[in-house]
């Protein structure tokens, strides 16, 4: 198992690795990066990661307007999800440790679901043990829909392949 961590403290990554290895008796190779753009660069260089763990608070925000922050976060995660694919499994699951202001049903969760990010941890679920569980077994699309409390008609799916034009746009 190879994991790319993007959390603002290497001690957090080390603690998660230690917990995972004791829970699942499996060795993890890992790397830590500290910026959203560094995640993209690392994935362009190395497609062999099995999981990506990102802390929403990875970078400090210069703005305190939540809408601006959410748009910034979504744009970064959208770009990361575009790069997050490997040759063995396809899409690399992204595990996002959300900030404490997030709740199930938040509008950003619908947008993240639409780009294939099914592993956001919210509220009291933001624990090392739950990060380890998602590293070991990421959520399915159906599980994410239930966890995020999303209705199907809320989701606008985004094409993974920018070269494919939807039929209704032809």
What positions do the PLM features span?
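Long, basic/Gly/Ser/Thr-rich N-terminal segments
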Residues: 1-165
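Walker A/P-loop phosphate-binding motif and the immediately C-terminal alpha-helix
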Residues: 167-170
